Each structure stands twice: as structure tokens, then as C-alpha cells.
């Protein structure tokens, strides 16, 4: 486990444009403490969907959640949650950031998402050769992560709708992306027994994209 030392002697600055909680804390940048909300969310249930405009702080808050569920106690020193959290468990965290990726074609999108799954398969076990679809691979990963760690998985998705918005001028591509995402996100419902927490962000209301049942 890597432990970073927060440099309290370093001049503080406003972290404009920085969306990574770890960098803000390590650099001792100005941070508005929202960790009490993290504790409340974790305690009160799943899943959560945050639909807000861009530049609203969604990515930073998701990064905050990621650090918490990865058990990064060192990054929360002096913050509200450090006074009440005692366990700091290291959950298996699946983090999907759709702010980045190649969404120019269906093939490129599948490949981009597949590479992300590849990285998790290296951590939680080899790919099941019988799992042909992205959804099947994701389903297997949630199960194997639970079995390997003894803890249910945490799934964090940033800008869930970005692929659809990028393809907005090509209806055929939108339909193809919607089909991929609908089956992929459908895994979250089917594998609920292996999931501890889900938090999804985006800018589009779910009833406008038809990918969640």
C-alpha cells in the first residue's frame, strides 16, 4: 500500500481544473471538505446517480469516493471523515471514466472499454474465455473480485452518457452505443449481490437515453 505524505508547508493554491482528490491533498491545495457527505452516502445505501452540468465538481467528488473506498486513510487526515471512520477497508473499486476514450466508431468504443476490463482482469483473475461480451466480462469481474477480496465491489462511473453525446449527430452510432451501454450497465442490477456501492455521474437524465431499466 502506498502512503503519501501531505506537505503542510507547501504554499496553498486554488486547484482550478484539478479533478483528482489525491493530487489536491498531496499538494496541500485548498479543499472544501465534503467528506461528511461521503460517510452519509456510504451508510445510507446504493445506487446513486448524480446528474449535473459539466464543471460542477462531479469528477472530483467521484475521485474522493474512489480514494475512500480504496482505504486511502492518509489522504483524509484532518478531514471530517477521519474523526469517525475507523475501518478504512480496501474494497475492489471499478472506476470507469468516460471523459476519456475513443468514441468515433462502435469498434473503437468496444476496444476502449475492453482495455479497461483488461486492466481489472489482471488484478482479479484471468479472463473467462467463455465470456464473449463486454457485459459478461464485467459480470465475471464483479464476482471474482468479491471472491478474491472477500469484499463486495464498488462501481464508480464518470460521465456515463459521454459516448452518446459525442455521437449525437450520428443516429446509427448512438443506437450502437446505447445497445452496448444498456447491456453493460444492466450488469449492475444482475450482480447486485456482489456490489457494495454504485455512484454514477452524467449530464443527461436517464429517461432521455433509455439505457437503464
Regions found by a protein language model. Give the residues of each.
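Phosphate-binding site recognition
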Residues: 1-213
Amino acid at each position: 500500500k502506498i502512503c503519501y505524505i501531505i506537505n503542510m508547508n507547501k504554499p496553498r493554491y486554488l486547484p482550478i481544473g484539478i479533478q483528482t482528490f489525491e493530487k489536491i491533498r498531496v499538494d496541500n491545495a485548498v479543499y472544501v471538505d465534503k467528506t461528511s457527505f461521503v460517510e452519509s452516502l456510504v451508510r445510507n445505501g446504493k445506487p446513486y446517480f448524480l446528474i449535473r452540468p459539466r464543471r460542477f465538481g462531479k469528477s472530483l467528488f467521484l475521485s474522493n469516493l474512489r480514494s475512500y473506498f480504496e482505504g486511502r486513510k492518509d489522504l483524509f487526515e484532518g478531514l471530517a471523515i477521519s474523526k469517525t471512520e475507523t475501518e478504512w477497508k480496501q474494497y475492489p473499486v471499478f472506476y470507469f471514466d468516460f471523459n476519456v476514450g475513443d468514441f468515433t466508431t462502435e469498434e473503437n468504443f468496444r476496444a476502449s472499454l475492453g482495455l479497461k476490463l483488461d486492466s481489472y482482469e489482471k488484478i482479479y483473475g484471468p479472463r473467462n474465455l467463455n465470456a464473449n461480451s463486454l457485459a459478461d466480462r464485467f459480470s465475471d469481474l464483479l464476482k471474482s473480485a468479491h471472491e478474491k477480496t472477500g469484499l463486495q465491489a464498488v462501481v464508480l462511473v464518470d460521465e456515463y452518457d459521454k459516448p452518446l453525446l459525442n455521437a449525437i449527430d450520428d443516429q446509427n452510432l448512438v443506437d450502437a452505443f446505447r445497445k452496448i451501454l444498456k447491456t453493460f450497465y444492466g450488469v449492475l442490477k444482475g450482480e447486485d449481490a456482489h456490489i457494495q456501492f454504485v455512484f454514477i455521474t452524467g449530464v443527461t437524465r436517464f429517461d432521455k437515453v433509455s439505457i437503464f431499466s
